[in-house]
Amino acid sequence: MKKTLVALSTMSALTSASEVYFIEPADGDKFMGDVKVVFGLSGFGVAPAGIKLPNTGHHHLLINADLPADMSLPIRADFNHRHFGLGQTETVLSLEPGTYKLQLLMGNYLHIPHDDPIYSEVITITVE
């Protein structure tokens, strides 16, 4: 029983200390054309969807979308909720001119946010 409690306690401490963030772009950046997005992660690992490993997950990029209201459900997959289930850590977005709000959210092997959700600050970019 003690081992189980220690394992749960360690997992909780790891997700609490974990951070997902944007390496690029920076908040307020302006672009002409495609936007390269590079994901950063500390205190946690990246693993493809479908692979259940402790202290890992994969990236989801929210575009002009709020965090899910129910974090116990899988993250939607659509234009505003991009899945990187192969374990990718960067992408290139082709966006129409406009202002975009971007946020990263980690999901587990089933695309469900972790019990202690790991998400980035929101950044805003403009495509001209």
State each model region's role:
Residues 3-13:
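Sec-dependent N-terminal signal peptides
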Residues 72-91:
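A beta-strand/beta-hairpin structural motif
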Residues 17-32:
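Short, compositionally biased P/S/T/A/G/V-rich stretches that sit at domain boundaries
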Residues 40-50:
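Short amphipathic, basic-aromatic surface patches that mediate peripheral association
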Residues 35-39, 89, 98-106:
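Short, well-structured beta-strand segments within conserved domains
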Residues 96-111, 119-123:
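Internal, hydrophobic beta-strand segments that form the core of beta-sheet-rich folds
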Residues 58-62:
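Beta-strand signatures of extracellular beta-sandwich domains
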Residues 48-53, 110-119:
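Beta-sandwich strand segments
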